[in-house]
Amino acid sequence: MIQRNINRVALIGAGSVGSSYAFALLNQSITEELVIIDVNEDKAMGDAMDLNHGKIFAPNPTKTWYGNYDDCKEADIVCICAGANQKPGETRLDLVEKNLKIFKSLVDQVMASGFDGIFLIATNPVDILTYATWKFSGLPKERVIGSGTILDSGRFRFLLGEYFDIAPANVHAHIIGEHGDTELPVWSHADIGGVPVEELITRNPEYKMEDLDQLFVNVRDAAYHIIKKKGATYYGIAMGLARITKAILNNENSVLTVSTYLDGEYGEKDVYIGVPAVVNRTGIREILELTLSETEQKQFTHSSTVLKEILNPHFKEAR
């Protein structure tokens, strides 16, 4: 893996998510170099120009330019945001066929550059495409990471914070599983400032589990509501991607709910799925295996099964 004094992120895909991610990187000065790659050269060039014009207002200047796949050779992270977008009424899994073809071409071109860093995948269905990137690239599983349920967990913490009138930073809760319709809340490990959420419910009649069940539905279906209102989701996921990038480049050893490869954890194998993991400069340092309730384990197994059923027709020989 490349170790340089200057951090470089290569962004592939300058659509709504990609450009929002680039904006977040510059505003937080997360990387020293950012190269933008897109099939639409004018869009990528325009983004690079626009971002450079605002660079003096950022905490630190980030060298930003429009480039090509050769620039991936010295990248520490290649973040892929390219692909077909989710349309109203379309699930993330409906996008599989279209995006697998796109990803094969993208990953092949990145690897041909001599890239030896970490892949960060955002394109949906993210768990499927992260697995595909791992297979296409031949990189160690620890160095291929998907955004997974980082945004779902962020939505979860935000809405729980609203419900209990507590800052989201003091809400500790995870959404795990597929980034999609079969994801699940881990109520057994959700707490507010160290006090279990389930205990808060029993202590105070003002709080009801029925409310929290609906709260989770709002988390799960958030993307559909946002897509219906504005056509796409991009700010939240871009900020989540920036958070993962920061954890990698700063060697933070931070616990984030990302899509990572399971090899026996949670009773599952050969699948990329959203779980809490320790993220640092090497990628995934380790997976944190939560002790799930019986119901949660069944739901997680179902989520994993759904993903495997989608993967099987495309990677049957490899599996």
Curated annotation (Swiss-Prot):
It catalyses: (S)-lactate + NAD(+) = pyruvate + NADH + H(+). It is an enzyme of class 1 (oxidoreductase). Allosterically activated by fructose 1,6-bisphosphate (FBP). Its EC number is 1.1.1.27. The active site is at residue 179. The gene is ldh2. This is L-lactate dehydrogenase 2. Catalyzes the conversion of lactate to pyruvate.
